[in-house]
């Protein structure tokens, strides 16, 4: 089979994906693709498309769509970097294929003409891995029905002995698909370590879940540490040396990308550190209304961060968006206190970390009495729920530090939560 026999066919991406590997090898050989046997199926399909497009004087376009306020958009290879923009997407193409910000688009682009900076997308082959026609039928995120979380994300990792923190969370503050949880933490209470453990646990226990770690106004070395410590998750960051506009733009893009995945029935977990810093950044970029709350916070500044957090939901039609966001307290800033008070009660789960427990080097520094999950009966088995209620009744009169020490001591003697609950019965 020669190139002239294959190139005119210009097979769509979906047809290439449906072919078996030997058929793709045959096409690749005819197109003169080198080392095609070393490529995985998806990469091979893209390589074939690239060769076919090149033969017709076009280029393969692939990237995340960012739609501007003027109606047109750009494909950028990097989820966050506008400098990676390579292809212009006209308003007509966006309307024709019902494209939205955050969509991952594969298609063909006309190469830039003289004095043009970008090529232009002329044909869409796939949207988020779907056929373009199927993508047109997608429901809108805001039209989907939110329900209470009813499937627990079990964080316990049987393969490691260093899992007491996650075992405690599983029992006392169970996290479900679609949870909207706040991790309320003073400085140096172990919130970053807890987030890392949760991220690693979910990526390992639930391969079907897309995990995004969003770090806003964070130290650069913390970002590096997260990227090296967390495997299988997308770590997206805007460090403290970036302007507040960049913080907000990064968060907006992550928000839109997560919504696109959920619209197709996927499951996403966003770990945000922190909602407080995101609200601070949004306060700086929001046009002043003249109505200022205590601490210098504009009354309109919390609208978008609340929209971000409020997107967390379990979807009746399928899919879920789970958000675990840290809220900073006891920082000495009146603004931080106001932000926390505004977000208090918006979540359906709270993990409250205690400075007193941290000072006594008790980790997780979880205040058992103040932490909990709403409608936990939908997540835990009835027999587990009864034992948890009994445990909470026993420790209700204890000092939080003593209660956590006792609980960790008992749990440390068992290999997993099943054994611990069986021991409680005894």
From Swiss-Prot:
NCBIfam families xrefs: PRK09376.1, rho
UniProt domain Rho RNA-BD: residue ranges: 58-131
Entry keyword set: ATP-binding, Helicase, Hydrolase, Nucleotide-binding, RNA-binding, Transcription, Transcription regulation, Transcription termination
EC number: 3.6.4.-
Subunit annotation: Homohexamer. The homohexamer assembles into an open ring structure.
A Pfam cross-reference name: ATP-synt_ab
Family annotation (Gene3D superfamilies): Nucleic acid-binding proteins (2.40.50.140), P-loop containing nucleotide triphosphate hydrolases (3.40.50.300)
Residues binding ATP, per UniProt: 176-181, 188-193, 219
Enzyme class label: hydrolase
Name of the protein in its database record: Transcription termination factor Rho
Top-level taxon: Bacteria
Single GO biological process annotation from the record: DNA-templated transcription termination
InterPro entries associated with the record: AAA+_ATPase (IPR003593), ATPase_F1/V1/A1_a/bsu_nucl-bd (IPR000194), CSD (IPR011129), NA-bd_OB-fold (IPR012340), P-loop_NTPase (IPR027417), Rho-like_N (IPR011112), Rho_factor_ATP-bd (IPR041703), Rho_N_sf (IPR036269)
Function description: Facilitates transcription termination by a mechanism that involves Rho binding to the nascent RNA, activation of Rho's RNA-dependent ATPase activity, and release of the mRNA from the DNA template.
Family: Belongs to the Rho family.
GO MF annotation: an example: helicase activity
């Amino acid at each position: 089979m020669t190139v002239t026999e294959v190139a005119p066919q210009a097979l769509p991406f979906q047809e290439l994906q449906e072919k078996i590997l030997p058929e793709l090898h045959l096409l690749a050989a005819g197109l003169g693709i080198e080392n095609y046997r070393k490529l995985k199926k998806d990469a091979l399909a893209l390589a074939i498309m690239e060769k076919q497009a090149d033969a017709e004087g076009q280029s393969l376009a692939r990237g995340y769509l960012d739609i501007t306020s003027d109606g047109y958009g750009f494909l950028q290879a990097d989820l966050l970097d506008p400098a990676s923009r390579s292809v212009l997407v006209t308003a007509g193409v966006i309307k024709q294929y019902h494209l939205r910000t955050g969509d991952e688009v594969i298609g063909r682009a006309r190469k830039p003409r003289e004095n043009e900076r970008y090529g232009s997308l002329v044909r869409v082959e796939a949207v988020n891995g779907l056929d373009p026609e199927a993508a047109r039928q997608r429901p809108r995120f805001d039209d989907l029905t939110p329900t209470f979380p009813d499937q627990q994300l079990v964080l316990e990792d049987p393969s490691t002995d260093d899992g007491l923190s996650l075992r405690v969370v599983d029992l006392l503050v169970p996290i479900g698909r679609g949870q909207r949880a706040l991790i309320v933490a003073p400085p140096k209470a172990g919130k970053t370590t807890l987030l890392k453990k949760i991220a690693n646990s979910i990526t390992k226990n639930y391969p079907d879940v897309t995990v995004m770690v969003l770090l806003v106004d964070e130290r650069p070395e913390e970002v590096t540490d997260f990227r090296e410590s967390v495997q299988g998750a997308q770590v997206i960051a805007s460090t403290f040396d970036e302007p507040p506009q960049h913080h907000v733009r990064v968060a907006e893009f992550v928000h839109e990308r997560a919504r696109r995945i959920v619209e197709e029935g996927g499951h996403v977990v966003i770990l945000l550190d922190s909602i407080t810093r995101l609200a601070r950044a949004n306060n700086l970029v929001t046009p002043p209304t003249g109505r200022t709350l205590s601490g210098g916070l504009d009354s309109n500044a919390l609208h978008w961060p609340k929209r971000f957090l409020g997107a967390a939901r379990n979807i009746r039609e399928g899919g879920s968006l789970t958000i675990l966001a840290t809220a900073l307290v006891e920082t000495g800033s009146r603004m931080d206190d106001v932000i926390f008070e505004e977000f208090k009660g918006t979540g359906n789960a709270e993990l409250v970390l205690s400075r007193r427990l941290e000072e006594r080097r008790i980790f997780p520094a979880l205040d058992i009495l103040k932490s909990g999950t709403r409608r936990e009966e939908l997540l835990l088995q009835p027999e587990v729920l009864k034992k948890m209620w009994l445990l909470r009744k026993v420790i209700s009169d204890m000092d939080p530090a003593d209660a956590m020490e006792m609980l960790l001591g008992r749990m440390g003697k068992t290999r997993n939560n099943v054994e611990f609950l069986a021991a409680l019965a005894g």
